[in-house]
């Protein structure tokens, strides 16, 4: 459990190797409240089977967003069209959906495929269907055409999902993002694995393997690096590692605690917890120069720092009030302000990308759940009903939270929308999974 005073010993052997996807997403709540959308299977214009069905990726993305609910393709009146010019509005008059996604895939040469995608405004088409013949282009919201390789099918499917999501909601899609997490495979000689994958668990890669525990991965703002804690030298040390080149640098190696690193919004500094002067306190360290600035100064434990988007303030967890609560500190003045009052404990907070809300772990009646606070009204909403929830990390578009929890006696990842309506579980095929961190936009 990510609570005050818990610091796991870390050690690692640096590795980089592909691995099979170990995560799947099981939607557990919220489908009925989602907006219906039609996704027509993309028309394959080649010989033999298609390398992959891009529309399957799009359907899964939209369903996992918690915002949309793709309707059963068997109920679609036209199931073999790829362009809006083939779209017959009258045939769609009884379909309860707000838009239609369609497209085609055509082989162009060795491992080269022309992918066409179009997004149609079904509501507009239905409203105008009774007004006589209309130009089909009137219904077209967006379209694109690109040549890609078979290896790029899944990524381009995520790109289409991003376009659809943004066009219909006004919010940038987060389907082309990654998550970092720790997998624990008990019984192995080096059971602790630091992994990264696409947001949906595909394209999983191992970055680190260790005989000792790993935790607290944190993404750099450009998505190229991870900060983490290691005990490989028999003491706590903070490292920053490039996920592409594997190059890494030791950032802090003070006596005692070196923990909970998190990148500043400009990527130049880390906020972290150090006990070099006695009690665990919040510090900020310059990654290049290693210059250190102490931020808090209190006899109680201060830990789990997180940045506001403007880089001028931090939130952190402290026991200075007698129990773990979340506080805000302004870096320029050092002024500290208590943020949370509801429940028994509040800890592990992070600020949403727009700076308007805070996601954190709330303990009430002995139960640890993920909660959201509106920073203007201070209204608190408990988002989850799972058990022993911890380590929340917010998607870069602010719509979803991934977190660690316990399911059937194992540590797993789960997700919840920031309005609490949509919930999903991300079980691992092998081992236990914890300490998730959602990447920035890539």
Swiss-Prot record:
Gene Ontology cellular-component terms listed: periplasmic space
Residue stretches spanning the membrane: none
Domain of life assignment: Bacteria
Subunit-structure text: The Tol-Pal system is composed of five core proteins: the inner membrane proteins TolA, TolQ and TolR, the periplasmic protein TolB and the outer membrane protein Pal. They form a network linking the inner and outer membranes and the peptidoglycan layer.
SUPFAM superfamilies for this protein: TolB, N-terminal domain, Tricorn protease N-terminal domain
Cleavable signal peptide: 1-21
Subcellular location: Periplasm
Organism, as annotated: Shewanella woodyi (strain ATCC 51908 / MS32)
Keyword field: Cell cycle, Cell division, Periplasm, Signal
Main localisation: periplasm
GO biological process, one term: protein import
Purpose of the protein: Part of the Tol-Pal system, which plays a role in outer membrane invagination during cell division and is important for maintaining outer membrane integrity.
Entry protein name: Tol-Pal system protein TolB
Gene3D superfamilies: TolB, C-terminal domain, TolB, N-terminal domain
This protein's encoding gene: tolB
Family to which this protein belongs: Belongs to the TolB family.
